[in-house]
Amino acid sequence: MARLSLLISLFSLALLASAQAHGAMDRAAHKKRGNCRPKSATSTSTTTTSSTDDSQPTSTSSSAVAVSTPQGSSGGGGDKCGLGWPNGDDGTILSCSGQCSWYHTWSVFPVNVGSALQFAAVFWGPDKADEWDANILNAGTNIAMFFNEPQEPEQSNIDALSAVPYWRTHMQYLKDQHGFRLGSAATSSNPNGIDWTNTFMQACPDCTIDFMCLHWYGTTVDDFTTYVNLWHTTYNRNIWVSEFACQNFVNLDQQCDDVPGFMAGAVAWLDSQDFVEHHAWFGMMRDMQGVNPADGLMNQDGSLSSLGWQYVSS
């Protein structure tokens, strides 16, 4: 525990010394990214909020999720590459020649059960509990991830102690009775993210967490790798980076000069680390929700952007 406390203290001091390091997001800046939460499948709006939270996405094509599953690729796509696919933004996931292996929708609803990509369900937040329980066993997956940025007021917004009963009631039985692999809550890269997770882990030693989920936004590969390494060494578990991009939320006037270069360096490092199981660049969507449009993997017509092709194919 002394080692854990020291690591957290050093991490917090480093972030305070440089707000940009590790992609720290203050609440006002984070709000500009919008709510990454499931949207109505019938909505044509590109906003990130929905008038209802109980609608599930539908596919408009039987070819949804047509990216082939790779066999041990070490390229920029590779078997670690994933897609964050916001529900309702498009009816299908693009067919492409890349090698991504999985996707999530910030929800319990897959785009198309039985498709080529592995679906990872996300229990987005407390208000999704009934929806989660009603659908998780029919979602065509054995992977479940916990709350989305719970320490952020504009996201799932729940303190760590209050989150523990939700895990015990809605997550743990999936592991114990159905053999699911379970991922932690995915906190933002604010300094309080690791504090939230530390409190949760201490309060719930009986919670079976198979891998740690995390989000990161910043502008240097060194800061990114330092942050991911910190989570691995602190919790001694494998890592899923379910959101990351080259984005400065602290100073919006200082964005990445070379997004493709950042992606190339970050993805190459992720793919070379045995403890990193999967990653998903933000984002595969038309509306980038306050993130630099240069980070977008999708053009406005729904086709892959040049960066999108780099991510899934390089």
For each predicted feature, which ranges?
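Active-site groove signature of glycoside hydrolases
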Residues: 138-160, 181-191, 207-216, 240-241, ...
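Extracellular mucin-like PTS domains
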Residues: 40-70
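N-terminal carbohydrate-binding/catalytic regions of secreted carbohydrate-active enzymes
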Residues: 76-145, 157-158, 169
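Alpha-helical scaffolding within the catalytic cores
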Residues: 88-90, 103-111, 125-137, 167-170, ...
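Loop/turn elements at helix/coil->beta-strand transitions in domains of secreted/extracellular proteins
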Residues: 77-81, 98-102, 115-119, 139-143, ...
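Aromatic- and acid-rich polysaccharide-binding/catalytic face
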Residues: 148, 197-249, 282-283
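Fungal secretory targeting signals
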Residues: 1-36
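Substrate-binding cleft of secreted/luminal carbohydrate-active enzymes
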Residues: 103, 143, 255-314
